[in-house]
Amino acid sequence: MTTSYMNGHVTEESDSGIKNLDLASPEEYPKHREMAVDCPGDLGTRMMPVRRSAQLERIRQQQEDMRRRREEEGKKQELDLNSSMRLKKLAQIPPKTGIDNPIFDTEEGIVLESPHYAVNILDVEDLFSSLKHIQHTLVDSQSQEDISLLLQLVQNRDFQNAFKIHNAVTVHMSKASPPFPLIANVQDLVQEVQTVLKPVHQKEGQELTALLNAPHIQALLLAHDKVAEQEMQLEPITDERVYESIGHYGGETVKIVRIEKARDIPLGATVRNEMDSVIISRIVKGGAAEKSGLLHEGDEVLEINGIEIRGKDVNEVFDLLSDMHGTLTFVLIPSQQIKPPPAKETVIHVKAHFDYDPSDDPYVPCRELGLSFQKGDILHVISQEDPNWWQAYREGDEDNQPLAGLVPGKSFQQQREAMKQTIEEDKEPEKSGKLWCAKKNKKKRKKVLYNANKNDDYDNEEILTYEEMSLYHQPANRKRPIILIGPQNCGQNELRQRLMNKEKDRFASAVPHTTRNRRDHEVAGRDYHFVSRQAFEADIAAGKFIEHGEFEKNLYGTSIDSVRQVINSGKICLLSLRTQSLKTLRNSDLKPYIIFIAPPSQERLRALLAKEGKNPKPEELREIIEKTREMEQNNGHYFDTAIVNSDLDKAYQELLRLINKLDTEPQWVPSTWLR
């Protein structure tokens, strides 16, 4: 995987962290020049590698063009030479007749036909004989002297060896170039054609389908793909060629790196341009580069498989490496950056509290490497070496995702979200109050960045990014309390009551506290804990209640100790709470499992309520849907899972399945719960 990485999109980095966060307008977003090479999926443009056969074809074409130019130049020179005194003198010599020049004897010479031109191959003896004939033809002293020099040159052993080499190269260059495959997967192309032809009932389409399905055609296509795959493989570079190329970089310290890269394993590196240089910017976890440990950030790439890289644009590097696999030979100038040996990084697991789409992020260093995720996803962060851009895998994708993806670092995400909020507040117009409505006193907030190190608890006012998680398997004798959350008329109370009625030995509710007087049929400790108002208010001040309220001048509430009593009895405590109670519950030691009961569509919700004899107004239904969105937006980071209650029976079965799964499978919980 090779991409380009442009620095300075968002920050100026220093040892102290981020100096500046510049959120530009969409028109001013930096232009991405990253081109993913060898990246999983169909990313970027692909170009066939240049093989030796194709190079020879181009060389041969260049030679043909040079030959034509030489002929044109020769004609011009001939006009000038005809005016010379020497040629005038030679023209006075009577022409000889009957001279047989072996140069033009095609029967003795080897004539090779080429797609471009015919080449005559002569021996040294033929050249020597031709010069002898010319020597007898020219009678002036200057010509005789010139011919004598040529005869001596032809008899020289070095010239004869060079002449043989010339003939050998000419023969090789004259051979027709072998065809180069356009694609190596013609079988896939034929399958696409067959898919297109399925609905076609015309005679020609059916004939083509039958022809493509014929065994001989199928065998031909298979043979084509096998040969094409071998043809498209680059020829390995020899040590001699590598060492010869090193000499071109005289005083520079270079190193040679060889990496074996399989077709299905990306290289896993990013590059950037610095002037004419191509510099390795980032090593991505999971790629061949990271596994080899031979490529490092800051190395300058001089050559890849004998092809010079210095001076190339990152797009050209993309084209070059798009289909390379096998042995890759890099000639590098090692980075001058002094870095401590990399410490063994521990993998941390985090729960995402926001949605992220790299295609909509103008600041991601490489969009092809960006990892998209949704609120509630578990991410396995394997590298925080770059504090702004972590490398991570999404839960469940480790086997299908060979390369780690880039996700925003925690502090980076917090800072830019804080900056966005500040900008939005500054742009928000001041609404003028009306005469019949009191103007709301808007509290002025100090514009400071959120410091994650000072507070790990989340408020609705705080910026939610990630929460570190750990796997937890509940003990058999200490069940996690089940909390049902949802808007009114969404069925959470009905689901809770059905569980209580059907499995009384397994589920129980916490006994609430109250300040009202006990009635005759009530039993203290079974129906309510009856306490004084003074004691109740003292417990509120001490934070002992999960939630509480006042009804008809009496206080009611559910305490943490009441829930703990149910857990200690070995039963599962069932609670239906308001969202305001979730933070207190999460900060306790009860380890709650919170399930959000969401309503179905507005029409389906109307039908469900009609079965219960309710006839809600359209505005009431819209209010329920809007309340659902509000609860998800403000408290969704507390939810472990959600159930859409489109059918009460199905919702009950799904709820029971989730509760049973807590006994058989470990679940992700905040790491602070286990410390």
Swiss-Prot record:
Reported effect of changing L379P?
A: Failure to restore localization of PALS1 and PATJ to cell-cell contacts and to restore tight junction and adherens junction formation in cells where PALS1 has been knocked down
What are the GO BP annotations of this UniProt entry?
Answer: central nervous system neuron development; cerebral cortex development; gene expression; morphogenesis of an epithelial sheet; myelin assembly; peripheral nervous system myelin maintenance; plasma membrane organization; protein localization
Domain (L27) spans: 120-177, 179-235
- Which tissues is this chain's protein expressed in? Expressed in the retinal pigment epithelium (at protein level). Expressed in the vascular plexus of the retina (at protein level). In the brain, expressed in the dentate gyrus of hippocampus, striatum and cerebellum (at protein level). Expressed in the sciatic nerve (at protein level). Expressed in the kidney nephron (at protein level). Expressed in the lung, and heart. Expressed in placenta, brain, skeletal muscles, pancreas and liver.
In alphabetical order, the GO MF annotations are: ATP binding; guanylate kinase activity; identical protein binding; protein domain specific binding
State where composition is biased (Basic and acidic residues).
54-79
Q: Where is this region: Disordered?
A: 51-79
Effect in UniProt of substituting E34A: No effect on interaction with PARD6B
Name of the molecule in the record: Protein PALS1
Organism whose genome encodes this protein: Mus musculus
